[in-house]
């Protein structure tokens, strides 16, 4: 394979990995530990 192909696949895989990690953190089990600043703020 050419270097550009390997580099492109590596960058695409990294972006997919970051996206999956962000979705897991936002909607998966770790989301229970996140606080909602709008619920914490009292008027």
Swiss-Prot record:
Its main location: membrane. The chain crosses the membrane at residues 4-24. Belongs to the PsbN family. InterPro entries: PSII_PsbN (IPR003398). It is a single-pass membrane protein. One of its GO terms (cellular component) is plasma membrane-derived thylakoid membrane. This is Protein PsbN 2. It comes from Microcystis aeruginosa (strain NIES-843 / IAM M-2473). May play a role in photosystem I and II biogenesis. The keyword Nucleus does not apply. The keyword Transmembrane applies. Pfam families: PsbN. It is found in: Cellular thylakoid membrane. It comes from the Bacteria. Keywords: Membrane, Thylakoid, Transmembrane, Transmembrane helix. GO terms for biological process: photosynthesis.
């Amino acid at each position: 394979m050419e270097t550009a192909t390997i580099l492109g696949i590596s960058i695409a895989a990294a972006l997919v990995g970051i996206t999956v990690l962000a979705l897991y953190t936002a909607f998966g089990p770790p989301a229970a530990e996140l606080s909602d600043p709008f619920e914490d703020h009292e008027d």
